[in-house]
Design a protein with these regions (language model features):
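Short, solvent-exposed secondary-structure boundary/capping segments
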Residues: 38-42, 75-86
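Hydrophobic core residues within well-ordered beta-strands of beta-rich domains
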Residues: 11, 26, 52, 63-65, ...
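N-terminal helix initiation/capping motif
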Residues: 1-35, 98-117
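Short, well-ordered loop/turn sites that connect or cap secondary structure elements
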Residues: 46-48
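A generic structural motif
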Residues: 34, 71-73, 88-90
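Short conserved beta-strand and strand-loop elements enriched in small hydrophobics
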Residues: 14-19, 50-62
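Solvent-exposed residues in well-ordered beta-strands and their adjoining turns
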Residues: 18, 41-43, 57-59, 70, ...
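Conserved hydrophobic positions within beta-strands
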Residues: 30, 67-69
Length: 117
């Protein structure tokens, strides 16, 4: 059984990334996000263990860090799904991301509670 250190939250945010191999910006979007990494969807190919620079727009901030591709799945629709592990998230970015993810989880829990009543 797989154990995750950080909770994943399903959210969609724009992503720009540059790979170490091909350093031109490519566009993707998050499928889910955690303090440890992100699952992204892209039209451009990625390779397992590839290093990259990631920018994720979470208004009003942009989270920037280095990352490593942990896995790659090719979907039937031609899109690529990839798991990215964050490698050098700065403390201010980590704190912003933590607060954002907590807020999203709190809002969803509240919405779930209200929909049951």
């Amino acid at each position: 059984m797989e154990r995750r250190i950080h909770a994943r939250v399903e959210v969609s945010h724009p992503v720009l990334y540059l790979t170490d191999i091909y350093p031109r910006p490519k566009v993707a979007s998050t499928i889910d996000l955690s303090l440890g990494g992100a699952k992204i969807e892209s039209l451009s190919s990625l390779a397992k263990d590839e290093g990259l620079r990631v920018s994720i727009a979470i208004q009003p901030e942009v989270i920037e860090c280095r990352g490593k591709v942990i896995y790659v799945l090719e979907r039937d629709n031609g899109r690529i799904e990839a798991g990215i592990q964050f490698e050098d998230l700065t403390e201010p970015n980590r704190l912003y991301l933590k607060q954002y993810l907590f807020h999203v989880m709190e809002q969803r829990a509240l919405e779930a509670t209200l929909s049951v009543e």
